[in-house]
């Protein structure tokens, strides 16, 4: 075995391992070795390479890698095809910024073809950084043969899906109100909108709509979007709701009966009550009357009107609201549009022409106030949708869009979702299920440039539609010969014209591109260019056994995968979904570059290593919970877990090499109870870890491993050190080497999916082979000893209590104490005699015994809890307090046992005192201190005799010299001669403990003499000792 370089950094170790993986093609071998095995199917959600990775990507990549590595080691064949999401607005916006242009008009002036070329060039801006990040974090995925959404084969598969959907009659062109981003100048789908809600404060207005031909009668309508008022064409009431006419300050207002108090507040008089249906068709004067409205400005009925907020009357602007649009269509009212594609008012609103509508709420309200049409205004906090790409507030516009009739097969969506196992489980019928229940038809088209072109050609004469399902299909119907290298992007496909099979006229492609979420949702099919090739491979790789992404993908990729597959095949595309929580800063705030609280995962790997970052992300909390995260979290993972494991591994290699121990040779071994215990712990942990991993409970698995590593380091190795330090190779020492070797090799396999670099380093050095080509550990039932584990757990509890006891009383473990008494509160069959030496040695006590009668070593003190007893006992509280103080210890003991006592205040007058009225304090026998955990109480004799004090000094001296040896980098097995120069009292103490010193410090000869200032000095409290070490002769 190679010597472990303890000075090598984690980053250095990981770079070395990466180099070895690449040189030996370990990733490729891990897949090839499973050829013919059952497939475990994994889908990679495609990131975009025109932005840099963040900590959330580190979490996602870690989880996906853990799954793939574990399943591979568990015997499955796991293909891992990378992917790139390359279309969409972020790319366009980046190119616009690069070119110094803005908006569709300037793009078209620049030229669609050169703009598309720039988009294609920019999509892999950060590919090199993504590749380096992916490799540095240890995520094994095939980045040399990825699926790329901009490539013709991928787009052709998407066209086949869309063509099939069109063939089924589920793709249609419709006129409806859709969410619209005025900055990007395109509509969005409902699942895109769901990703961008923000809590904002907007100006709301309660508006006076004057009843036509009345003197002073007004309908009151409330709106949170004053900018829509110029497009008002009607007011809606609920036909079955009650409304009142109420007089206030000379005006009569019509408002819902349930809302009158909230709206009018005070000083009003209800004149009459009316059903909503009585108000229908009453005309009013619009605040912004438009001559284009030839049928409108009247009250209509609508079921969506409620009395939950506002006035119970809804202002209707059909161009900017889905409900508004539907009710106006059914009533046959006029339609009014006063906003252009940039979100600015048109000449229809002259005094605001050219202004962005969301900036005009104040102008509108001022106008209303000037015209005496404003009843009330206030800031209103509500959740408002923003563009998930550019962060601009969205508007709702009526216009033409291409839609997929997802609502027609809603039952298929719901049934398919019912077959999926969600982590966490509540997502199935909660966040995701509710979204499916309320879904609307998918707005698939985008009025942009860089994306998969919508493959629908329309006849200019008869409106017939043709949706080619392949390039060959398009060529077959093309009016002219199409280039062999036809690129399936704008403007190239726009140049292809098709002859209408119905009337013989020319058909042109509809100009839109499609929603990028349809691109990524098509990846199970398009990544293999299905159905044009790789049919067997596709069938083997569909559906996915598991997918894992952030919770924000609930209405993104998780939805689009489910939707595309249901529309195309009717089948569900995945069996399990891991919905990962957000990674927040240490204050619980969302990380953001603008806030300055974002952590760069590349920097974290560079500082602490990928293993530490991965472990920190895994062990902190359940993966679906939001987690607070900081550099300190990663540093703690490194020091507590990775470094602890490396220290154990380094210790083993150091001593095994010194003793020339060879794990491949056969030795006479005699296992101790400690060996049997650690092997049982190893295999019971293996059992728990496998169970947790099979159920995707990665945090539980990681915590089990962390507990095991801690116990191996701080209990097994520490308790076994004397065996390793012995000279020669006896049977117990050979057993210690054999056991620790087996433990380390098995742990390296257990942690291989979690921390692949340190796992590889340990396994490679101990066995000569890559851990990632091994099988995952299986439980050896014959090594399980539950009783032994329970006993050792009890010992560990007692030792921990003893240490805590010492800390509370500032008694260092180096200071011997006379006695430890263990009080057992529950009888059990624990054989403490077998563990006597361990407890005494760990807690440095001279005697140890177990006592069942705790009254021998403890007593109780009762103090009245005046806070509770005062109100209960009133004037008698002081008398009760005095009575408590004079109780005998037997009476106190009886009170503690029965939890009640009766105090006779006066003849015939009794008070019942319970443990709720009293503070019960357990007090140790004089000279003893106690610590308890409910199961056990540890009593330590704290009287330190002169003899014990001197031994404590000697042990403290041993510690100081051991540290000094480390500073000198002396070999651990080097025997030395020691010369000391110190005061006479310390000389005598050390002389009295000469054997103890020689045994623990590998000292052949101790002498005392005069040393100069040039010699080194040690500090033992306030005492100084000069020391000189030399190699023993």
UniProtKB/Swiss-Prot annotation:
Location of the protein in the cell: Cytoplasm
Keyword DNA repair: no
Renumbered ranges of motif 'KMSKS' region: 590-594
GO terms for MF: aminoacyl-tRNA deacylase activity; ATP binding; isoleucine-tRNA ligase activity; tRNA binding; zinc ion binding
Catalytic activity: tRNA(Ile) + L-isoleucine + ATP = L-isoleucyl-tRNA(Ile) + AMP + diphosphate
Family (UniProt): Belongs to the class-I aminoacyl-tRNA synthetase family. IleS type 2 subfamily.
Protein name: Isoleucine--tRNA ligase 2
Organism (species): Bacillus anthracis
